[in-house]
Every structure is written in C-alpha cells, then in structure tokens.
Amino acid sequence: MRGRVKNYILEKIREHGAIHMTLIDPEKTTPEVAARIAREVAEAGTSAIMVGGSIGVSEAMTDEVVLAIKRSTEVPVILFPGSPTALSRHADAVWFLSVLNSQNPYFITGAQMQGAPIVKRYGLEVLPLGYIIVGEGGAVSIVSYTRPLPFAKPEVVAAYALAAEYMGFQFVYLEGGSGGEPVPPKIVKMVKGVTTLPLIVGGGIRSPEVAKELAKAGADIIVTGTIVEESENIRETIGRIVRATREGALERSRE
C-alpha cells in the first residue's frame, strides 16, 4: 500500500509523542550481527530500523543485511543510502534525501537522479527527506562536501528547514555527525517553531538524557547508531533511550 511506512511513522509519533529509530551500517556489521541487533532494539521499543550510512556499501551488502533484519523482526526497514549503490529491493521504504547544505550539486540532485530509476524499479516507498548537516558534521560533512551550519547560527538552520518544507520534502533531518556533538536543543526548538514537518535528529546521541532533551525541544524522531555498535547490553541501552524520548515528548506536550 502506497504510503504505508509514512503512515506508520506518523501514527507512532501520534501515539508516543516522539519515537526512536536505530541506524545499522552494513559496512560495520555482518548480517548475523545486524539480525541480532534488530531483534534486540525492536524488543526495546525502537519503531523502525534504518540501514545505510557509509558510501562504500554495495547493493549485495545492503541486501544481505536487510534480509537478515527482516527475518528477525517485523518493524519497518528504511534505507538510509550513502550512495545509489546502497539500495535494496527488499526494504520497506527509502529516505530519498537531499543534502541541502552541500556545496556539491551531486549530493543535492545528482545522486538522486541516479537513484530514482532504481527506486522506481524496486517499487520502494519513497520518504522525501531534507537533510541538513550542523555542528562539526563529522565524516558525513567531508564525504558530502558540506560546510556544516554552526551551532551559533540556529536561525540559519531553521531557514534551511523551512526551505525543505517549501520545496516539498515530507521530513527534515538535522545531522550532527556520527561520534560528534549532538545538535543542541535550542536549534531543535527553533526549527520546530518554523516548520510543520516531522523533525528527525541524529548524530552524537549517546545517552537517555540527551535524547530526552532533544525530544522535549521538538524532535519527533531520535536516531542512534554508534551506541548500538558499542553497547554490551543493547536492549537495556536502547530501552532507556526509547523511554527517555517518550518522556521528553510528554514534557513538551505539557508546556
């Protein structure tokens, strides 16, 4: 059914106030490990699993990880492709993203042009996403030729998010970069104040406290990835972040 994953995401946000998604990078895991991670994070309450991130990922690698995840859990699998080669016909949907503050047109429209026919051929549900890199940005800013937007200029980040809405994107994503500093709550709050789009925040989120503050500030979706690669007890770690995310959204609703 067209729009099934989008409707699922929006319904989960309505139900919980804010939700959590787990990012699994095929380059940093094996299908067997990915399946175990997926099962544990799903049991902990994550609402969807994103697959992707790195640029050196082939379709075969993505296929193997996606299929392993889908055999182990029923939560939706959404592709988060670092390049057009990282698409899989077996996923439930794809974040069809444009890096809005890239200085290289390839990451704004070029890769999207290359990937669009593949997405259509595979029949993937498309989730149009305006992707904005802020703060240090980490490796993703280097790879995508992006000048990250400084934390000290939240109004510029908000303007990009508003532009994403006016350009027709259905979601907006604030990326702090893997392993870097998380996006500050003040930026999240300002962005949420100018756009009606569901707001995704990821990068550098390593604790329930940070997840709670970001959800309280306006994040509708919290994404974590590195933390599951490092955690010795994935179910407990993600469970705490899921609960904190929902608590933050509840506090926001009471303000």
From Swiss-Prot:
Keywords: Cytoplasm, Lipid biosynthesis, Lipid metabolism, Magnesium, Metal-binding, Phospholipid biosynthesis, Phospholipid metabolism, Transferase. It comes from the Archaea. Mg(2+) binds at residues 25, 54. Its cofactor is Mg(2+). It is found in: Cytoplasm. Its main location: cytoplasm. GO terms for cellular component: cytoplasm. It catalyses: sn-glycerol 1-phosphate + (2E,6E,10E)-geranylgeranyl diphosphate = sn-3-O-(geranylgeranyl)glycerol 1-phosphate + diphosphate. Belongs to the GGGP/HepGP synthase family. Group II subfamily. This is Geranylgeranylglyceryl phosphate synthase. It comes from Thermofilum pendens (strain DSM 2475 / Hrk 5).
